[in-house]
Amino acid sequence: MSESCPCCSGLQYNACCQPYLTHAATAAEPAILMRSRYTAYVKHDVDYLIATWHPDLHPEKWRESLTESCQNSQWLGLTILATSPGKIPDEGYVEFAARYISEIDSQRTEVMRERSRFLRQHNRWYYIDGVHLQTGRNEPCPCGSGKKYKKCCGQ
C-alpha cells in the first residue's frame, strides 16, 4: 500500500504527486504544480524543484540553497488557500500556507504564506516567483485549525 501524499490532498502518493516527481506526468494547472513542488521539498527532490522553476530564471544557481532548505526543514502540511488566473491566459497564481519546523532557527512550528506566480510555456507550467504574505494576528490561522492566528501558529 502506498503512503499518503505529503501535499495533504488526501490521495495516496502514487496516485497524486509521485507521477510528477518521477516525470511520468506534467502538472495540468498551477495548483497541481504547487502541490508537487511542496512534495519535492518534503522528499528533498531538489532536481524536481529546479526542473519546475522557469529556465529563464537560471534555477540551477539556487541548488545549494534549496538543498539546505530541504535538509533543515521538517515540512508538516500544505493548505492551498486560493487559486486565480493571471492577466494573460498562460499565467496563474496559487496562494498557499505551508507549515514547517526549521531545525536551524527554532524548534517551533512556523507558517509560510505565499502567493506564487506560475507561467505556462510549451504546454508546461513553471514556478516564476512568489510574494510572502503576512497573516494578521486576528485573522484565521492559515493552517486551517479554525483558531485565530495569534492563538495558533502565531504564538
From Swiss-Prot:
It comes from Pectobacterium atrosepticum (strain SCRI 1043 / ATCC BAA-672). Belongs to the UPF0225 family. InterPro entries: NTF2-like_dom_sf, SEC_C_motif, UPF0225, YchJ-like_M. It comes from the Bacteria. Gene3D superfamilies: 3.10.450.50. It holds the Pfam family YchJ_M-like. This is UPF0225 protein ECA2332.
